[in-house]
UniProtKB/Swiss-Prot annotation:
It is found in: Cytoplasm. It comes from Legionella pneumophila subsp. pneumophila (strain Philadelphia 1 / ATCC 33152 / DSM 7513). This is Elongation factor G. SMART domains: EFG_C, EFG_IV. GO terms for molecular function: GTP binding; GTPase activity; guanosine tetraphosphate binding; translation elongation factor activity.
Amino acid sequence: MATPLKLYRNIGIAAHVDAGKTTTTERVLYYTGMSHKIGEVHDGAATMDWMVQEQERGITITSAATTCYWSGMDKQFESHRINIIDTPGHVDFMIEVERSLRVLDGAVVVFDSVAGVEPQSETVWRQANKYGVPRIVFVNKMDRMGANFLRVVSQIKQRLGSTPVVLQLPIGAEEEFKGVIDLIKMKAIHWDEENKGMTFKYVDIPADLKSTCEEYRAHIIEAAAEYSEELMEKYLEGEEFTEAEIKKALRHLTITNKVVPVFCGSAFKNKGVQAVLDGVIEYLPSPTDIPDIQGVDEHGDVIHRKTSYDEPFSALAFKIATDPFVGTLTYFRAYSGILKSGDTVYNSVKGKKERIGRLLQMHANSREEIKEVRAGDIAAAVGLKTVTTGDTLCDQDKVVILERMDFPDPVIAVAVEPKTKADQEKMGIALGKLAQEDPSFRVHTDEESGQTIIQGMGELHLEIIVDRMKREFNVEANVGKPQVAYRETLKQAVEQEGKFVRQSGGRGQYGHVWLKIEPQEPGKGYEFINAIVGGVIPKEYIPAVDKGIQEQMQNGVIAGYPVVDVKVTLFDGSFHEVDSSEMAFKIAGSQCFKQGALKAKPVLLEPIMSVEVVTPEDYMGDVMGDLNRRRGLVQGMEDSPAGKIVRAEVPLAEMFGYSTDLRSATQGRATYTMEFCKYAEAPTNIAEAIIKKQ
């Protein structure tokens, strides 16, 4: 029996690395009856962390997808189908979070009640804002030393710029944490510890918390009153709101991203997760609550698709994974229509048809075969040949291309070589498969040295890749030292002529172009404009000029690093009836770009990282001094339960080996996180040293 769309919830669970997100997901699976025993992260048995590396490191790397059903703590709802994507919290894997949020309708963001809003959480929040994803918050670990619920609430307001609405208050904290107070029902909830919180009872609010509860309930009423004129009138008249009125108002305000409902508890101690599940149903959108999906047709005209089974089929592939048993899995979110196994779909980005063989409903790493996928579903297809992350699958007679995903360029590179001759071929296959799965991981061969270079978002990212080559593909590799992925760009506009002419008996070569080369704003990328009029260069040679320019850009002009953020206009040139060819124009374009770029004040760009260090106050001076020595710019400082938080922007080149240095400088008491921030021009002395090396 298919679940009606209004009873669907497609949600992600996202958080900082140690906020207890996977534990929260495990409890969700336990209470919804999907797993019969609770898997703990610290003993390496969590269901959603199914890769060996995840179980060893205790962190989540790939987004596992699973489906469960929930009808409320009090069994007060119809059975809702919840598709959950568990996302990684480590900064090197933010790409996984980004692509999950792109296909979700709502998110549960988990915060640690001791650490509060951490850098990773800010990144996740920004990504959720970018895709307009409504969210609810679960403040976890209320049983830990230093737990402070209200401090986290004020950080959500100040650091994340959102409007939190507190729906629960904790009863006690740290070891005294007993349960939570439901501020809408104005009742305390006590979960039964003997059956791991499967049952609970409502009891009266402790007398000493009554006035605080009334104060916070007043905030809820105030927020709800904003929903409609009717409620505002009631509010101004001082009339009571019913529970249904409050929930309806909060649901609307959450879905439109005006407020963020906040829950609290301790997943590890089996308190609070069940109420969060109720919150998912009550406040997060179903596929029918979100705006129609927008895309373009083959002519580039905007079209809308409703989330409905009657519309033509459309879906977005958001993840490719290699499964040891079934081969390539393509995870996709269906937005409209119905897809049955055996159907043929059209990949509108690549212009290729694909026949759908098996369709699978995923549960972490186990799977169940299904006959069809409907709008609103998240599922996986086996063995699709041409689909990569971000491609659209649709009905070939009703073509639509959905908005693609942007993936950041890698910032770090290492050379890898197979340990033995036998590993050589296997390594190529393994790296190809891993690059297909992960759009933020790139592989290429260095033309001069012949070495295989792998690039990624951080040291941990590449460590995991090398680890997976060994475990999943049996390839042993030696790994070089990490190298920084520099870039080059231009500071000045120039016009340049480029001519490639060869005469050597028989047919010659002739290509002649004039290019205008200009710098673009950072992040704008490469733009090629064809401004040829009157056929001075025939149409068929224009793509060759573009190709020649792009190849030269990849090889750099001053230090061999890719040139970024330039606009090139082809505005004049000439051709020869017999001697001109695509090859001649490609070479002319390439040479012309290089000659012009060298006159356009080329500079070297280096990746700058946002670094956040949490340190006891005693070591503050040492930490700051060390960051300055690393060419860091301190952006700000603030207090935290663990001492001081220092925020700085530091070039990646200066950050290798930082964790060891920080540990020894602070006797292992300071911690840090780092994520890519931007590319910036490298100082002259640094740039000269790098150019000399090449």
